[in-house]
Amino acid sequence: MRTCLLDPVQGYYATANTPPGTFDALTETRDVLGARGDFITSPEVSQVFGELLAIFFVARWQNTARDAPLRLVELGPGKGTLLADMLRTFARFAPFYRSIKDIHLVETSPGLMELQYNAIEKALEGTGKRLVSADQEVVGEDEIRVEWFPLVDSVPIRSDSWTMVAAHEFFDALPTHIFERSNDGFKEVLVDVERGGQSGITVLKPGDLTSSSKPAVGGPPKFRYVTSPGPTPWSLLLAMRNKRFNSLQPGQRVEISPEAWAAARRIGELVSGRKAAEVAPEVEEESAKTARLQREAERVQTPSQGGAGLIIDYGDEKAFGGSFRAFRSHKIVDPLEDPGKADLTANVDFWHLKSALFTTDARPLRLMYQAHFLQALGLGPRVEALEKAAANDERRADISSAAKRLVDPTGMGAQYKVLGVSSEASSGGSAEAVAKAKEPADKVYPFEMDEGSGGASAEKQA
């Protein structure tokens, strides 16, 4: 998945929306988002989606960190549509908007970076804000720094800024491993070249420059799925040691993404403004333990402004075993066909993400259906206002249709889930004080309401 999606020359996202000739004559470029692309996302459907996400962040800031400078972090911003819609909404709240100092984006595609920059510039027009270089040390009240990072782990943890993190359809594209239960443990599902009955082992004599086997006639080799002959290091680490998968029967499969776990942990660090605590080793010398406890004391004493996060993706609070697939031109296709020319994706295991967030000073909130989340934040009144302001009946019909698509119980409304992440501002203190601070000082709307409606949590099982 990593190679097919992120290869710097032939990768699906690296070549997305890149002008022809950027790489070489053989490298195709394409639209990946929207009607002309391979898939469409909620921000592309309606501006209301980004507006309501912005309202959530404004409300959290008003409740927790009114005096703090603001930073917006988005993972996988696509064309910048969600980012632009949020910025336009933020501009309506003057104190909040003035406090925004930095925008940090996780992106690898040069073509998409350019689209994102243009989207930000257009969103800032007429709002009293302008973009400045990431190298500028001091940011004025009318300026916003924007900076791109190749990895979420590259985004710096900041305790002096209230950090908003938006991860919309980011986790589904992270590389995943597939494991199959066998009678003696777990084997890993791998990708191999279709060899037409030949052995998978090719012996090269000293001095040979090429393999003695000839490529298949008629084009590039085809690929196939195979299982490892026995356990692999990944299957031992990720599947065998996880009690969640003890009940799987021989032949059943499970998809596990260590990169998703690491990215969720980083989101917790960004939102809380602190690095996560070190994990104590099973065996530790007394001097090493003393040094580790000293580092932990220093960590929890660091004041932090806190933050909030939203993770929006398709999946559930459980693991999946057969969700790995590919999209091309809005249709599901064989993931092994034409690598690098289709979007590869797998359902998100939100319990896997929560387990990572639990290791940080941030706290995961209840998982909600996208429909319930948007409706709770005012989708209905906002759509009514847009319909009243529409220039004609056709535009009104488009607005209504787009809104219905966002909350469709047979589509986006139920397939997409929203996981909130929260962290209260903290002045630091003892470990006990920090642990107590993780208890909610106030209920986070709409995740922690008493009505009980809107939840999307499944049983915490494989």
How does the language model describe each region?
Residues Q10, N17-T18, D38, E44-V45, ...:
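Short capping/connector residues at structural and topological boundaries
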Residues P77, H168-F170, I312-G315:
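Short, well-ordered beta-to-alpha junction loops that form the rim of enzyme active sites
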Residues M113, L174-P175, A319:
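Conserved protein kinase catalytic core
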Residues P233-A462:
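Long, Lys/Arg- and hydrophobic-enriched amphipathic alpha-helices
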